[in-house]
Amino acid sequence: MVYIHFPNNLTEEEHMLQAKYQKLKKKKKALQAHKAPKQEPESALTLKRPTDARDAREVARKLIKSGAIPAIQKQQTKQDQTSFKRPKGQERAKRSTSETTVAAYQPFSSTQNDVAQETIISEIIKEEPRRQNLYQHFATERVREERGLTEKVTLDTTQPEKPRAGNTIFVSGNKVTEEFLKKTFNDYGTIVNVSMEIEKSRGFVSFAKPESADRAIAEMHGKSVTGIVLQVQLARRQPQIVPINDASSSAVWSSIAASKSQKGSHKDLRQMVQYNDDFLM
């Protein structure tokens, strides 16, 4: 192992270096103190009274922003604390009445104002129960929906409509003719009339009895006859058809015919005039 021994006393060179270092240290401190900016003493703010009100307002605003002076807070009076907000409905009614007033001489304006205020108050009182009823209605509906009790009750006060009946049927098909309709529907009953709409390929067949029309609709609707699919329905407009072969009508006409002879009871009182052949020549 190697031991190094440092003497307690400094040599001359070390003393010179130490003195030099102390001088440099003092110079450095003096240079830093010279370069550092000097702090100027704060000057007291001298408030000058501005000549204009606008300038005073600007100065006060700047001072409040800088925090030099606090903002003045308005003290609430007892009347402000006990005041209440006017209802919206009353404000709306008051605005509408003020807009509708006419600038003219009104000798009874004070009484009219009292009446208007009374009407406004009565309207507000009427609106409150209506709002409560609406709220109750929506609340009950919501409860019923949550519980699953939404049931729509339909009360049919009207009587059930009677089934339609008639003698005339509506027939439509591709290239339908009058002869085709007579031939096809002749088996269901006596045909009174057949009317055609040739451009639209449809027609109307009138039977003597409604039963024949019902049977034709039941059997021929949607049926194909000679390659033509027929659409048979009851006609919307039913013409009034008087039955021809009715027993009562035939009896009436037979009695009238029996009472009257074919020649009649009138006697001809005229004399026959005869002409000769020479006169004709």
UniProtKB/Swiss-Prot annotation:
Main localization category: nucleus
Domain of life: Eukaryota
Residue ranges of the region described as Disordered: 25-109
Keyword terms: Chromosome, Nucleus, Repressor, RNA-binding, Transcription, Transcription regulation
One Pfam family cited in the UniProt record for this chain: RRM_1
GO biological process, one term: positive regulation of transcription by RNA polymerase II
Localization terms from the record: Nucleus; Chromosome
Signal peptide per UniProt: none
Residues covered by the RRM domain: 167-237
GO cellular component: chromosome; NELF complex; transcription repressor complex
Biased segments, Polar residues type: 73-84, 98-109
Feature: compositional bias, Basic and acidic residues: 49-61, 88-97
GO molecular function ontology, one term from the record: RNA binding
Stretches with biased composition (Basic residues): 25-36
Stated family: Belongs to the RRM NELF-E family.
Free-text function comment from the UniProt entry: Essential component of the NELF complex, a complex that negatively regulates the elongation of transcription by RNA polymerase II by RNA polymerase II. The NELF complex, which acts via an association with the DSIF complex, causes transcriptional pausing.
Assembly and binders: Component of the NELF complex, which is at least composed of TH1/NELF-D and NELF-E.
Protein name in UniProt: Negative elongation factor E
UniProt source species: Drosophila virilis
Lineage: Eukaryota, Metazoa, Ecdysozoa, Arthropoda, Hexapoda
